[in-house]
């Protein structure tokens, strides 16, 4: 560390005549204090040489007296022995992602939603935002007066604004003030235990200052300053090692080293920005106060933040940060807005695995031109055929891009992309590269138009594109290697063949090891083969074999649903089983016959017909029957008009005597369609206790509202009770 101002010699205030234990404790406290001044306050008070001398003295003392070594000693940051792998960590509070905004309108709509959710009126969005730009030496000095003028009514929502760091999200768990665990975000539910590596990051305190909660889980970002990144790459180049493409990749790669000693040599930093768990301490009333509290505990918190009111304050912050983005000492890809009051955050809650009270406002993506060398297709896990442009390498948005999504065939036609074209490539949201436009004046004479393949490049099955859909799909769902894992998981789910114990991890191993290729292969599995899988004991293997054996006896509608035919859900599977009675009747049906089935329209009929027409799918069905999968069959039933056919219902709230699933079954048995959201096409809303926004929307649209008794009365009136 380089001192900004020289202090007295570090040892001048050391106690004299102290014991080794007292001296070691004093050294630890001094080193942590100097680290706090350097990394948190950005105000070092001693030169590097003095710090190093204290550090070496403590190392020597602990080596001479091993009993004095403590887990939170600064000497423990140097890294221990290499790990064989990272353990998984289940986040007690999920690390959710944020919804993104890219345009000013997205921010205005976000503010409006927050205000409405909190029961506040919102002013009309301003036509322009004329807040003066901040002076070059002060990012936020120009905003306060403009914000006050824009929110004179005092009714606007208050937000905490922060930078969105381009690093790696991290969870730090402190118990009684001591760091006990660090984990990556992972998929939000489960991350990796990187405690040994995080302990080497000098910016992260091993012991919190002052009075800390009994449990505090801090959320933040591990990143690398640009200057540190440049120095690291220079060292890598000098030693003949591979250099990193950008600070984010360097930070992520450094943190995920199995050898903590390598991580210890990498200049990683950290900023705290949120909290997961907190026990033994009252939470502050606002997000901004919580960040202030973090700083008092010795956690690094970015100073580039502000509390504002309303959409204008948010947009002013975004604009000012954007103007200074290139001058900041670290990479950011946007700013983050959070409703400041914690009580209001709780009132707004969450939707679709993201908080309603927060928004990540991304900066405009960077764009570059390159050439399309080829257009290939990729097959997704659900069979979606996605065209991908293979590009001449181009450095854009901080990375070298060689591929870009073209989304679908219509998008290629709309943008008129040809093989050989010069195109503008953008990293949408600074993450996913995409082709934005073609530079037509540079089109070569030998440019070739893209032709969507008629056969799947993975399994050779027919490629279908249903009317009204933009995505083409492989029809070989049961045999296509690209779809194999998803097909098996769907086949085994509770509402299909109900094979308990056949989850993600088991399916992943069975497919990756080549043990299972189609659902029929499941019925060849024995205990020995399953027990050989990772984390699969003999008892678990025996239970899974028993569950597979039990699934041989099923119902025709469950079997049809388990096949994973596109657009065929549980209700349609029941209709097909009831209508045809025997599976062979279904397999022999053409589109005209399928259209005779209740609630089967042209799109569903075409999807079923395409599935049946694929020989590989019929072959797997026969293999399953040969493996002993069976069900009771009946005689076909003629289609009869159902009393509520054509009527759409929506269920909301808690019904007094039945579950919503039971109510749904009754309504569907009478021919009704049960939808998940209210629209002008909704005929009835059945509302129970604590009905929410669906009931409000129904009342706004004038949709008929029934309670459970009213629904049962209606069913009785039409003879469907």
Swiss-Prot record:
Gene3D superfamilies in alphabetical order: 5' to 3' exonuclease, C-terminal subdomain (1.10.150.20), 6.20.10.30, BRCT domain (3.40.50.10190), DNA ligase/mRNA capping enzyme (3.30.470.30), Helix hairpin bin (1.10.287.610), Nucleic acid-binding proteins (2.40.50.140)
Limits of the BRCT domain: 639-721
Spans annotated as Disordered: 1-23
Annotated EC: 6.5.1.2
A GO molecular function held by the record: DNA ligase (NAD+) activity
CDD domains: BRCT_DNA_ligase_like, LIGANc
Binding site for Zn(2+): 456, 459, 474, 480
Cofactor needs: Mg(2+); Mn(2+)
Active site (record annotation): 164 (n6-amp-lysine intermediate)
Pfam families found in the cross-reference section: BRCT (PF00533), DNA_ligase_aden (PF01653), DNA_ligase_OB (PF03120), DNA_ligase_ZBD (PF03119), HHH_2 (PF12826), HHH_5 (PF14520), Nlig-Ia (PF22745)
Key word DNA repair present: yes
Classification via InterPro entries: BRCT_dom (IPR001357), BRCT_dom_sf (IPR036420), DisA/LigA_HHH (IPR041663), DNA_ligase (IPR001679), DNA_ligase_AS (IPR018239), DNA_ligase_CS (IPR033136), DNAligase_adenylation (IPR013839), DNAligase_N (IPR013840)
Major enzyme class: ligase
Keywords from the UniProt entry: DNA damage, DNA repair, DNA replication, Ligase, Magnesium, Manganese, Metal-binding, NAD, Zinc
One GO BP: DNA repair
UniProt biased composition (Low complexity): 1-19
Catalytic activity: NAD(+) + (deoxyribonucleotide)n-3'-hydroxyl + 5'-phospho-(deoxyribonucleotide)m = (deoxyribonucleotide)n+m + AMP + beta-nicotinamide D-nucleotide
Sequence positions that bind NAD(+): 48-52, 97-98, 162, 185, 221, 338, 362
GO cellular component: cytosol
Stated family: Belongs to the NAD-dependent DNA ligase family. LigA subfamily.
Function: DNA ligase that catalyzes the formation of phosphodiester linkages between 5'-phosphoryl and 3'-hydroxyl groups in double-stranded DNA using NAD as a coenzyme and as the energy source for the reaction. It is essential for DNA replication and repair of damaged DNA.
Protein name stated in the entry: DNA ligase
Originating organism: Cupriavidus metallidurans (strain ATCC 43123 / DSM 2839 / NBRC 102507 / CH34)
């Amino acid at each position: 560390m380089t001192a900004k101002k020289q202090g007295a010699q570090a040892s001048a205030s050391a106690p004299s005549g102290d014991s080794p234990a007292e001296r070691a404790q004093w050294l630890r406290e001094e080193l942590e204090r100097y680290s706090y001044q350097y990394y948190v306050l950005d105000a070092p008070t001693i030169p590097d040489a003095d710090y190093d001398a204290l550090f070496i003295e403590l190392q020597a003392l602990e080596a001479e007296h091993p009993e004095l070594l403590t887990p939170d000693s600064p000497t423990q940051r140097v890294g221990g022995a290499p790990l064989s792998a990272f353990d998984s960590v289940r986040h007690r509070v999920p690390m959710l992602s944020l919804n993104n905004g890219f345009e000013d309108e997205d921010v205005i709509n976000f503010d409006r939603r927050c205000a409405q959710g909190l029961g506040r009126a919102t002013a009309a969005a301003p036509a322009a935002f004329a807040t003066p730009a901040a002076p070059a030496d002060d990012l936020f000095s120009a905003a306060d007066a403009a914000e006050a003028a824009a929110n004179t009514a005092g009714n606007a929502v208050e937000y905490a604004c922060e930078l969105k760091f381009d690093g790696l999200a991290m969870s730090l768990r402190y118990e009684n003030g001591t760091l006990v665990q660090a984990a990556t975000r992972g998929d939000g539910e489960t991350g990796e235990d990187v405690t040994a590596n995080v302990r080497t990051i000098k910016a992260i305190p091993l012991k919190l200052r002052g009075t800390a909660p009994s449990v505090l889980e801090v959320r933040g970002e591990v990143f690398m300053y640009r200057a540190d990144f440049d120095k690291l790459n220079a060292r890598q180049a000098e030693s003949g090692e591979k250099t990193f493409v950008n600070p984010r990749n360097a930070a992520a790669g450094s943190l995920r080293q199995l050898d903590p000693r390598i991580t210890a040599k990498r200049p990683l930093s950290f900023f705290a920005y949120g909290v997961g768990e907190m026990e033994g301490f009252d939470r502050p009333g606002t997000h901004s106060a919580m960040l202030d509290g973090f700083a008092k505990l010795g956690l690094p918190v970015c100073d580039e933040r502000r509390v504002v009111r309303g959409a204008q304050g948010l947009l002013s912050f975004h604009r000012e940060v954007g103007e200074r983005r290139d001058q900041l000492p670290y990479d950011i890809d946007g700013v983050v807005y959070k409703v400041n009051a914690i009580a209001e955050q709780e009132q707004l809650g969450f939707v679709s695995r993201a908080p309603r009270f927060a928004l990540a406002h991304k900066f405009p993506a960077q764009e570059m031109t390159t050439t399309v060398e080829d257009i290939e297709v990729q097959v997704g896990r659900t069979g979606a055929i996605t065209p991908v442009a293979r590009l001449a390498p181009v450095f854009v948005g901080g990375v070298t891009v060689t591929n870009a999504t073209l989304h679908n065939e219509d998008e290629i036609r709309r943008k008129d992309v040809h093989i050989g074209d010069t195109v503008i490539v953008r990293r949408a949201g600074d993450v996913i590269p995409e082709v934005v436009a073609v530079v037509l004046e540079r089109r070569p004479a030998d440019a070739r138009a893209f032709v969507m393949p008629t056969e799947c490049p993975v399994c050779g099955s027919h490629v279908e594109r249903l009317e009204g859909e933009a995505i083409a799909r492989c029809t070989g769902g049961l045999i296509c290697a690209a779809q194999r894992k998803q097909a098996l998981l769907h086949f085994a789910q509770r509402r299909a063949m109900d094979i308990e114990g056949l989850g993600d991890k088991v399916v992943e191993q069975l497919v990756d090891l080549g043990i299972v290729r189609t659902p029929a292969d499941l019925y060849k599995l024995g205990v020995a083969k399953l027990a050989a899988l990772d984390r699969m004991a003999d008892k678990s293997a025996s239970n899974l074999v028993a569950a597979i054996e039990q699934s041989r006896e099923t119902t025709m509608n469950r079997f049809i649903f388990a096949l994973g035919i596109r657009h065929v859900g549980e209700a349609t599977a029941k209709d097909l089983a009831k209508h045809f009675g025997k599976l062979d009747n279904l397999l022999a049906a053409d589109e005209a016959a399928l259209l005779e089935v209740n609630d089967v329209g042209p799109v569903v009929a075409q999807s079923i017909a395409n599935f049946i027409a694929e020989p590989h799918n019929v072959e797997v069905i026969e293999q399953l029957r040969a493996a002993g999968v069976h069900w009771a069959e009946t005689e076909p039933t003629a289609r009869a008009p159902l009393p509520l056919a054509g009527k759409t219902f929506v269920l909301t709230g808690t019904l007094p005597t039945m579950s919503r699933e039971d109510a749904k079954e009754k309504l569907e048995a009478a021919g009704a369609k049960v939808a998940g959201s209210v629209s002008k096409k909704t005929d009835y809303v059945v509302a129970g206790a604590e009905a929410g926004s669906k009931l409000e929307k129904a009342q706004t649209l004038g949709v008929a509202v029934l309670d459970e008794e009213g629904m049962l009365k209606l069913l009785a009136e039409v003879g469907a009770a």
